[in-house]
Amino acid sequence: MANLKERYQNEVAAQLQEQFSYANVMQIPRITKVTLNMGIGDATSDKKLIDNAMGDLEKLSGQRPVITKARKSIAGFKVREGWPIGIKVTLRSERMWDFLDRLVNIAIPRVRDFRGLNPKSFDGRGNYSMGVREQIIFPELEYDKIDRIRGLDVTITTTANTDEEGRALLSALNFPFKK
């Protein structure tokens, strides 16, 4: 079991219930899923890029990514409807907690010139989105075996009703937000 999950169950849930004075334990915000998305715009010209990106994301997440396809044609981007333009993975339960544990304790501290996560990246419903500029901050990916630096989007979906509740949940789980 991941350290973050144990910490949530043993400390954070009680702390949040006290802070927001919830009457029912089911009202306490919790993380439901983490979605990792990697947009690969160059995949229209080189099909190998998708395979390499899928390998990277599979090493990060522990499960096989799904290819996302263009919904409509856009001439300016030289994209046709149905062409592969990205990949994504949705993590739940144990894999989600393992990924969050590695993200907070290993990957984020390895970011160059890191000054904290942007506290304004909540969506109004307690969900948090962040971008990772370089996938090499994760120790699972070996620097020598990467064909190119790619970024990815990490979206953390919670049951929180407001941004304040979501921020309190993630802060209690040691997410380093800017002050």
Swiss-Prot record:
Keyword Repressor attached: no
MF (Gene Ontology): rRNA binding; structural constituent of ribosome; tRNA binding
InterPro entries reported for this sequence: Ribosomal_uL5 (IPR002132), Ribosomal_uL5_bac-type (IPR020930), Ribosomal_uL5_C (IPR031309), Ribosomal_uL5_CS (IPR020929), Ribosomal_uL5_dom_sf (IPR022803), Ribosomal_uL5_N (IPR031310)
Disulfide bonds: none
Entry keyword set: Ribonucleoprotein, Ribosomal protein, RNA-binding, rRNA-binding, tRNA-binding
Entries under Pfam families matching the protein: Ribosomal_L5, Ribosomal_L5_C
GO biological process terms on file: translation
Alphabetical list of PROSITE patterns matching this protein: RIBOSOMAL_L5
GO-annotated cellular components: ribonucleoprotein complex; ribosome
Oligomer and partners: Part of the 50S ribosomal subunit; part of the 5S rRNA/L5/L18/L25 subcomplex. Contacts the 5S rRNA and the P site tRNA. Forms a bridge to the 30S subunit in the 70S ribosome.
Family per record: Belongs to the universal ribosomal protein uL5 family.
NCBIfam families linked: PRK00010.1 (NF000585)
Free-text function comment from the UniProt entry: This is one of the proteins that bind and probably mediate the attachment of the 5S RNA into the large ribosomal subunit, where it forms part of the central protuberance. In the 70S ribosome it contacts protein S13 of the 30S subunit (bridge B1b), connecting the 2 subunits; this bridge is implicated in subunit movement. Contacts the P site tRNA; the 5S rRNA and some of its associated proteins might help stabilize positioning of ribosome-bound tRNAs.
Name of the featured protein: Large ribosomal subunit protein uL5
Species whose genome carries this gene: Chromohalobacter salexigens (strain ATCC BAA-138 / DSM 3043 / CIP 106854 / NCIMB 13768 / 1H11)
Organism phylogeny: Bacteria, Pseudomonadati, Pseudomonadota, Gammaproteobacteria, Oceanospirillales
